Amino acid sequence: MTKIAVVVPTIRKESWEIFIQGWEPLFKKHRVLLVKVEDNLEWPYVETIDYGFDHIAQTFKPFPKFEWLFNKSDTCRNAGFYIAKGFNPDVYMSFDDDVLPNDNDPIQEHLDALQMTVPKHWVSTCQDIYPRGVPYGVRGEIEVVLSHGVWANVPDLDAPTQLLYPNLKDIAFNKMNVPKGVLFAFCAMNFAFKPQLLPYIYQAPMSKRLAEYGVEVGDRFGDIWAGVVAKLACDEMNLGVVTGHATINHTRASKVFVNLRKEAIFMELNEQFANEWQNDDTTNEYVLLYKKKLASWQADLAKL
């Protein structure tokens, strides 16, 4: 049976209670290791609940103060990935604490997506089948290692778009592979990946702790930029990425003006982040910090 570790960052007791009620049947079905990263104190602590046996819980309190961990943001999920690695899972998944399954099984949908092989450069214009013209020789070129899930109900939009479309619900998504050389907007509220991607899935430094390094304080790009870095790594390693195969219900709309303040600092950098990341001569202070912390993350993972 596939060993699955599910990482969930949380700061809200009420959200956690609803989350567990909605997800526990699937956690029991798939016998997952649940890794809860609680980040509402001065420093996060991590609790593991193994649904493969009885409800065995172990608490790490507080989490070790590794220099790559930035708390007080959803990038604290890095702590969960680190702890999960010690259990040697076959698949890592992560969900936000305000998402729920619909009448589906998102865990199985991710597992199915990670069994796929896909073209390196081609995409299908049809759902679940290749149309006439896609060469047979390219249809299973590369192994999928990252499944980016999507959401029903409340969409994950940036603040300016939220202001333009305040009542938007249930936007449409495509099931597709993301070809080599193409980037996409990665949202960490619902995704799964294989172990070989763990060194590159590190969620980018965010939150007020950036000020300790002389970098302007911003937020809400930790998962976006992690997605850029992970996709570039997949391209380099000839590994595949798919999106749209696993769907959850996103239940909570975030506060638009709070989001606007958090996003404003990094909006300009987001326009050029991929280029700055790939530029060996970059002088951007944030990108240099990110690269330093990513190297620290990879070094600590290698010790496990």
Predicted regions and their residues:
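N-proximal low-complexity "stem/linker" segments adjacent to membrane-targeting elements
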Residues: 1-28
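C-terminal catalytic/acceptor-binding lobe
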Residues: 5, 15, 159-162, 168-304
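Short, polar loop motifs at secondary-structure junctions
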Residues: 13, 35-42
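Active-site-proximal specificity loops/subdomain of glycosyltransferases
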Residues: 40-88, 104-108
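Short catalytic/ligand-binding loop motif for oxyanion handling, primarily in non-cytosolic enzymes
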Residues: 42-43, 100-104, 250-253
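Conserved catalytic core of nucleotide-sugar-dependent glycosyltransferases
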Residues: 55-64, 101-209, 283
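Short aromatic/hydrophobic "clamp" motif used to bind/position activated sugar donors
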Residues: 92
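Active-site acidic Asp-centered loop
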Residues: 95-97
